[in-house]
Amino acid sequence: MDSLQPLFEQLFGSEWGGPLFLLIKNLLLILAIVIPLLLAVAYLTFAERKIIAYMQVRVGPNRVTFFDIPWLRGWGQPIADAVKAIMKEIIIPTGANKFLFLLAPVLAIGPALAAWAVVPFSPELVLADINAGLLYILAMTSLGVYGVIIAGWASNSKYAFLGAMRSAAQVVSYELAMGFALVCVLMMSSSLNLGDIVAGQQGGSFLNWYLIPLFPMFLVYFISGVAETNRAPFDVAEGESEIVAGFHVDYSGMAFTVFFLAEYANMILVATLASIMFLGGWLPPVDIAPFNLIPGMVWLLLKIAFMLFFFLWFRATFPRYRYDQIMRLGWKVFIPLTLVWIVVLGMVMQLPEVVRQSFPLNLWFN
């Protein structure tokens, strides 16, 4: 694509051609990430309904199809749901702050999409390959809670506001544990660049992945990710049996759908980061044929799908935690555990080279 830059400079001049080319190039790259992401979100909802239906000995969506093709029954359900949401009216409650009520979904979906700018899908395919990629993602994901808080406050509903406060406290609690877990990855890779983190796990087999030395941190990260996305069994912010539907109880139509998209986009982001930082990213489990003949992006997508399956499995299996249980798990279990692991990891990294060579520590520590 860079070969087209001289053509733009010839058509529009050197002063305007270069910037215009970069603008169009970046817009196309953004669309190349956002459009597949939205399709993935749509069909993740379909997969969720089918998997949970299978676990509950049901059929799931099996009516909407494409061109009456029998083996595609149900595959048109996400498209039908999107059309229905677009056609529905956005009802603004009496007494609500209209501007903030409509701004809240934008504040929720914006960071959820912006975080994908630094996520690499292969060594070459990344929108913005910045050195502080991990820090950028943590900053973007922490901004999503503002949309939730504003939605709860602007709705002028006690149920929505209670759900928003629950969500804010929960996200802050588990963000600390998630951040400390990622500090361990940073210590092992010595980089905040996601591509460098994957490169640090190269070595020919899955034994070099950070999953093995950081397995407790992997569990802390993933469970904290489930809690941050308000998924079951941590979905107290949307507890139907307690506060009707949580912070988006008064939302309808596309406004509700945007919150829905943000939640599932964050789910995919958590699964993607788990795959990149602990499961070797696009690296094959063993660097021999036929595994190394499969494109790296295929391996990354398979790992993401594997991690997403646990999100769906949790929803079908576990009952909702009480709010005090969620807070206790975050503050009294995860945060102390991550702090202890950081100290232990730092001590191991300071061991002499002779001691490291007597144990298989050189697999992960260079």
From Swiss-Prot:
InterPro entries: NADH_UbQ_OxRdtase_su1/FPO, NADH_UbQ_OxRdtase_su1_CS. Its EC number is 7.1.1.-. It is a multi-pass membrane protein. The keyword NAD applies. It catalyses: a quinone + NADH + 5 H(+)(in) = a quinol + NAD(+) + 4 H(+)(out). One of its GO terms (biological process) is aerobic respiration. It is found in: Cell inner membrane. GO terms for molecular function: NADH dehydrogenase activity; oxidoreductase activity, acting on NAD(P)H, quinone or similar compound as acceptor; quinone binding. One of its GO terms (cellular component) is plasma membrane. PROSITE patterns: COMPLEX1_ND1_2 (PS00668). Keywords: Cell inner membrane, Cell membrane, Membrane, NAD, Quinone, Translocase, Transmembrane, Transmembrane helix, Ubiquinone. The chain crosses the membrane at residues 27-47, 99-119, 134-154, 168-188, 206-226, 268-288, 294-314, 329-349. Belongs to the complex I subunit 1 family. NDH-1 shuttles electrons from NADH, via FMN and iron-sulfur (Fe-S) centers, to quinones in the respiratory chain. The immediate electron acceptor for the enzyme in this species is believed to be ubiquinone. Couples the redox reaction to proton translocation (for every two electrons transferred, four hydrogen ions are translocated across the cytoplasmic membrane), and thus conserves the redox energy in a proton gradient. This subunit may bind ubiquinone. NDH-1 is composed of 14 different subunits. Subunits NuoA, H, J, K, L, M, N constitute the membrane sector of the complex. HAMAP family: NDH1_NuoH (MF_01350). This is NADH-quinone oxidoreductase subunit H. It comes from Nitrosomonas europaea (strain ATCC 19718 / CIP 103999 / KCTC 2705 / NBRC 14298). The gene is nuoH.
